[in-house]
Amino acid sequence: SCIPMLKRLLESQGVAMSKALCEHFQQSRAELFQIVASTGIRTFSTLIADHGTGTGCDICKPVVASILASTSSDHILDDETAALQDTNDHFLANIQRNGTYSVVPRLPGGEVTPEQLMVIAQVAQDFGLYTKITGGQRIDLFGARVEQLPQIWKRLVDAGMESGHAYGKSLRTVKSCVGSSWCRYGVQDSVAMAVALELRYRGLRSPHKIKMGVSGCQRECAEARGKDVGVIATEKGWNLYVGGNGGANPKHAQLLAGDLDSDSLVRYIDRYLMFYIRTADRLQRTAVWQETIEGGLDHIRDVVCADSLGIAADLDDAMARHVEGYADEWAGVLNDQEKLARFVSFVNAPDESDPTIAFDESGPRKVPLLLGMPGSVNAVESRA
């Protein structure tokens, strides 16, 4: 969207801009975060009754749902919070263009065992799913109907896998090269560090998605400087880069601190992420946050590395609570009949499947057919 750019342009010209989240909350996202964190409010209805107006909208409801998830270990489909989620979080999967969903199990650091590969392959074959390796070193399974998701995830969870959170505004992946274990150029064990970071920050809800990378040397095979948090090995330890991303407006991550030992590296990442989660605007990536926060990267460095605001212990404690309280979201669904009941195409006909879902398998790969959509009638004919 061009809205954030327009806001920054107007602000640079001295135009006073409202920080209100939407018509129902006059506070910014950061202000709402502080209200929730300081008051212990755990429901949207209480928050809007005490600090907002009306009944909410498609802007404020997902934002509040994210804030509630960032400040507790409650399941995102618990009680009234479930109704706040957008389409992807509502079914813990990414909706695709024909109404089916993708399934992405977590493969920490890109590691996967032969046994896990066999389970993934068998699941894909049994459910007729299209498979593809992602840019984040994971395996994506496409074409699952909503009612198939619990069946698919039960088999993956039983095999020791868990949600990869590809559907959420949260940590996605920690990409890594093979590092010093295998590569003759590697100076540190990048795989071990990537796995440790992914297991630490998995499930961490934030204003936008978070991607990380760990490279075992300066050759940068994991493309760490194109990530929100990038780690590059040195002979003395690790360089920490922050605020990178790809997408329509790619940004190179900037150096936050250099030659860190492993403990200091993790501590600084903890504080950086928690400071970002507390102060960023709605749907704001780390790169834009660094550019727009007062004082920029220098201020962030002072907060993270020098505790200039005196909140380092609080940030550390908040991350410790997240790590201790983490639970796999799909395992939580599989153990709860009430949550399982939502995975149907039609709530008034739970045993019926969506008849508009179809696929074209006549070409080199399986693709969705968009029945009832403009141009879909000739989709098969055009490939003949």
PLM regions and their residue ranges:
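Small-residue-enriched alpha-helical segments and adjacent helix-cap loops
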Residues: 9-11, 23, 27-28, 101-239, ...
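Flexible, glycine/charged-enriched surface loops at secondary-structure junctions
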Residues: 45, 62, 76-80, 129-135, ...
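A glycine-rich phosphate-binding loop feature that marks nucleotide/adenosyl-phosphate handling sites
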Residues: 2-6, 173-177, 211-219, 286-299, ...
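N-terminal basic/disordered segments at the start of proteins
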Residues: 80-113
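Ferredoxin-type iron-sulfur electron-transfer modules and their immediate structural context
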Residues: 1-39, 46, 60-67, 180
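C-terminal accessory nucleic-acid interaction domains of nucleic acid-metabolism proteins
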Residues: 284-384
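Charge-rich, low-aromatic oligomerization/scaffolding segments with amphipathic character
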Residues: 3, 33, 59-62, 68, ...
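Mobile "lid/hinge" segments at catalytic clefts and subdomain interfaces of large enzymes
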Residues: 216, 220, 225-287, 299
